[in-house]
């Protein structure tokens, strides 16, 4: 056939499908006109009207056969049948609005929750990092006794970079802070110090200006900086002539040389606005024992992460032998950069996705139960269609179309709920959390989420198509018109419906137990013993620019003036300063070596905290032995320290630590300190983290330009925060403040508390919805069972059965289903809780109290859900029941 004629025929058939009855009616009218012409010719030949019509029809070859032949030649039968199925499915949904609305709402809840959580999983775990060839990027850190992932020292970085053969490039970064002079005064800003090739290793090129030159991170190089895109827009109005401008940071001039792309985010930079070269000028930068840097490297082609780990560990061992005093016990930790960024939140997101998936499963099972109930009323319809010649394939296709239509409606509503849910969840994430999770900033329903929704829709559509057919086997096509058919399948349906209810209850138990364990874990975390009183405490960080306070004596004078002025404020009871706030992180560590003991290369790592004399008293922590610091203790006096109980137990077990001395790994004379006191184990690390050995130094003996001010007040701690800030600015407007908060809020908003609270609330919400849906499913099955057993109940009551026995009959069935669901659910819940044990704090996966509580709650709800059908069954009139049958 000519290809153009073939194309024309195909287009004609395709268009005829959508023209529908209009095209067929036009052809029928034309056939009828031809038929009338032939009839008139036959009448003129003297035939009777009947003979004339008969001969005309014979001449045309049969009118109906001609119409059918036209339809077959000018339409696509399969597509035409599909459109018929769609129209019929729409009529079915409109005919049962209550069923349609109920099923669509159930599906939308499950689909919306699953898609919303999947969007978070997609953004964090599935999408590649926004860098060139991100699978070749690795995080490079050290490994020590207390840390599996520890910062590098600058000398170690130089050696690692020089000696390795696995990275084509290797660079470092570290967070820092500056004071930026603004119209309102000095403002603390976040920044990052990076080596010269940092952005080249990532594969990022500035959109304006240039990258750092090679060697621009050397101490002798000029002070330059690259701006974050948002900083360029907000602080500098997006000026195109910004390159070359000079900005004062902490009193030092920095020349702007470039602007980063708008889509550049680095999750580990602490929200840096300014990027400056790493100039190793400070005393800490040059010490091998001072660890403050994090590394990134680009793997050479063909090098695996395992090979990189092996070589860097070998280099670390070589440096340990070369520098035994500083590098004792130091290893290497090499991992993919993606794992470094999202590894900690992976189990959380997967837990959320599993919970949402279980909720979706309950919703689908509930809708399947509704379809089973609805299939009872359609048994006669299916039997009639089978009697008229409809094949089983056509009937299956019809049910599949109806299922897909229902799922499509649920998907449309679910995508709307997913969009709302994502915006709600993102709005609940504290702003400072986005610094470590920038991939959530532009969260949306991408093509991954659309494909995920399509997969859900396809699977659910098939489930909803198959479910009614389980109720209507082939025998329904033959016997569906018979009166006895319903009774022959009622028992089978009840068994299948009961299995669905058990499945619902089992899933609900798993979610409820998970929510209960996470809720208990949150309670345990928020009530953990901090060893200090967090009530009525205000906290803020003070930034004193090094250009204004270059020497220790300048800083000491400022700190003493701050303490004096703050102490004079109304309602202030005590004031303390510390280098690191409690309940923040375990870090800022050093290695110690004990005077008078043999040294065998032990790696004794401890937390270091510089605190003022009244700091321990201000916290209301217990002094267990010895004494605290006094104001007379300063840099000119012998160095003294206070230790925590953990350090005393680890290194002075059975001894009195008071008067004992220790120093750094080399026992330099200037590093020797004497222990004057032992205090309780203050929670220095993140909420709920293990207690580490800690050493408290007098803050005047080890100065830092950034320190934390803590104030205990007799009034509302929130109300005193403005007075604290204004008092500090009245001393010197060049001194900045940030992080103003109450200690209670500080703890409440801490990462550990937020993560546990999010897990508990989100999984708890899913569990509550699962409980409601499972109870609705149980109610539906019991109610339908009662309707199917009306005649049986009527016969029982006619033979003398009491209402109480009918109650027992129905409630016994509900209790059996509930018991099986609870037992299976508890078994599954313990297994699921074991998988998420990393999210639990102070709570066992098999916590008996939680398991028992869930069993009681679910059992009570099941009793209530079954009571109404049971009461209806007990109210059956035997005469009316038998007459109805």
How would you name each of these model-derived features?
Residues 9, 177, 190-214, 222-350, ...:
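Mid-to-C-terminal secondary-structure elements
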Residues 97-124, 128, 362-365, 407-412, ...:
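Short, strongly hydrophobic transmembrane alpha-helices
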Residues 117-120, 368, 404-477, 517-520, ...:
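Small-residue-rich transmembrane alpha-helices
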Residues 363-407, 776-818, 822, 872, ...:
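Interfacial "coupling" helices/loops that link adjacent transmembrane helices in transporter permeases
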Residues 121-137, 143, 270-283, 331-336, ...:
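Short juxtamembrane loops and helix-capping segments at transmembrane helix boundaries
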């Amino acid at each position: 056939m000519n290809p153009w004629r073939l194309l024309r025929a195909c287009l004609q058939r395709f268009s005829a499908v959508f023209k529908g009855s209009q095209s067929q009616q036009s052809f029928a009218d034309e056939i009828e006109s031809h038929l009338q012409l032939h009839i008139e010719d036959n009448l003129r030949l003297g035939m009777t009207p009947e003979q004339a019509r008969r001969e005309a029809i014979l001449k045309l070859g049969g009118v109906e056969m001609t119409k059918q032949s036209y339809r077959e030649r000018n339409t696509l039968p399969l597509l035409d049948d599909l459109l018929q199925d769609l129209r019929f499915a729409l009529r079915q949904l409109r005919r049962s609005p209550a069923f349609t609305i109920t099923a669509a709402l159930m599906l939308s809840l499950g689909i919306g929750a699953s898609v919303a959580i999947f969007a978070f999983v997609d953004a964090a775990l599935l999408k590649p990092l926004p860098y060139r060839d991100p699978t070749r990027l690795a995080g490079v850190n050290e490994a020590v006794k207390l840390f599996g992932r520890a910062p590098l020292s600058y000398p170690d970085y130089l050696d690692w970079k020089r000696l390795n053969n696995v990275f084509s490039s290797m660079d470092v970064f570290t967070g820092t802070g500056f004071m930026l002079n603004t119209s309102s005064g000095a403002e603390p800003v976040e920044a990052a110090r990076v080596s010269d090739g940092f952005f080249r290793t990532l594969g990022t090129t500035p959109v304006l200006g240039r990258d750092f030159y090679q060697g621009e991170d050397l101490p002798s190089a000029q002070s330059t900086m690259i701006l974050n895109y948002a900083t360029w827009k907000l602080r500098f109005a997006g000026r195109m002539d910004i390159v070359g401008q000079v900005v004062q940071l902490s009193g030092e001039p920095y020349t702007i040389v470039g602007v980063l792309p708008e889509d550049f985010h680095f999750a580990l930079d602490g929200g840096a606005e300014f990027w400056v070269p790493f100039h190793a000028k400070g005393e800490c930068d040059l010490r091998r024992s001072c660890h403050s840097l994090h590394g990134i490297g680009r793997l050479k082609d063909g090098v695996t992460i395992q090979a990189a780990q092996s070589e860097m560990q070998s280099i670390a061992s070589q440096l340990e032998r070369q520098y035994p005093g500083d590098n004792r016990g130091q290893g290497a930790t090499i991992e993919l950069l993606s794992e470094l960024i999202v590894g900690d939140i992976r189990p959380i997101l997967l837990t959320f996705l599993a919970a949402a998936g279980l909720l979706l499963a309950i919703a689908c099972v509930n809708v399947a139960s509704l379809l089973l109930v609805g299939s009872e009323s359609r048994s006669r319809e299916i039997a009639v269609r089978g009697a008229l010649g409809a094949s089983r394939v056509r009937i299956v296709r019809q049910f599949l179309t109806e299922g897909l239509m229902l799922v499509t409606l649920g998907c449309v509503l679910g995508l709307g709920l997913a969009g709302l849910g994502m915006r709600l969840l993102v709005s609940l994430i504290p702003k400072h959390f986005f610094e470590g999770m920038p991939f959530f900033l532009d969260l949306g329903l991408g093509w991954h989420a659309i494909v995920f929704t399509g997969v859900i829709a396809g699977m659910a559509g098939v489930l909803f198509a198959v479910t009614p057919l389980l109720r209507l086997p082939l025998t329904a096509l033959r016997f569906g018109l018979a009166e006895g058919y319903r009774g022959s399948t009622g028992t089978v349906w009840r068994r299948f419906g009961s299995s669905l209810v058990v499945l619902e209850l089992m899933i609900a138990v798993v979610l409820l137990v998970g929510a209960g364990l996470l809720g208990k874990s949150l309670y345990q975390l928020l009530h953990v013993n901090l060893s200090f009183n967090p009530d009525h405490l205000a906290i803020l960080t003070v930034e004193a620019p090094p250009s204004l306070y270059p020497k220790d004596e300048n800083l000491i004078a400022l700190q003493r003036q701050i303490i004096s002025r703050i102490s004079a404020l109304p309602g202030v009871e005590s004031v303390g300063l510390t280098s690191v706030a409690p309940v923040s992180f375990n870090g800022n560590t050093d290695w110690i070596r004990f005077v008078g003991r043999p040294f065998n290369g032990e790696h004794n790592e401890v937390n270091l905290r510089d605190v003022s004399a009244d700091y321990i008293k201000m916290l209301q922590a217990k002094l267990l032995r010895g004494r605290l610091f006094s104001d007379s203790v300063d840099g000119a006096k012998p160095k003294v320290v206070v230790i925590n109980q953990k350090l005393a137990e680890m290194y002075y077990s059975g001894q009195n630590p008071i008067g004992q001395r220790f120093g750094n790994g080399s026992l330099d004379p200037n590093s020797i300190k004497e222990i004057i006191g032992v205090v309780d184990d203050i929670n220095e690390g993140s909420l709920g983290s293990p207690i580490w050995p800690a050493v408290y130094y007098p803050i005047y003996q080890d100065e830092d330009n950034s320190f934390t001010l803590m104030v205990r007040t007799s009034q509302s701690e929130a109300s005193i925060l403005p007075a604290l800030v204004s008092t500090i600015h009245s001393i010197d407007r060049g001194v900045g403040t940030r992080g103003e908060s109450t200690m209670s809020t500080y703890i409440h908003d801490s990462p550990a508390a937020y993560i546990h609270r999010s897990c508990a609330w989100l999984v708890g919400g899913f569990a509550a919805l699962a409980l409601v849906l499972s109870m609705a499913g149980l109610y539906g099955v019991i109610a339908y069972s009662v309707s199917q057993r009306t005649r049986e109940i009527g016969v029982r009551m006619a033979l003398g059965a009491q209402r109480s026995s009918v109650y027992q009959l129905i409630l016994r069935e509900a209790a059996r289903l509930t018991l099986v669901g609870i037992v299976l659910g508890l078994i599954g819940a313990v297994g699921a809780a074991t998988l998420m044990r990393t999210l639990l704090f102070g709570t066992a996966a098999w916590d008996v109290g939680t398991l028992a509580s869930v069993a009681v709650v679910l059992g009570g709800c099941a009793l209530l859900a079954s009571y109404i059908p049971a009461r209806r069954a007990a109210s059956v009139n035997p005469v009316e029941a038998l007459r109805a049958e």
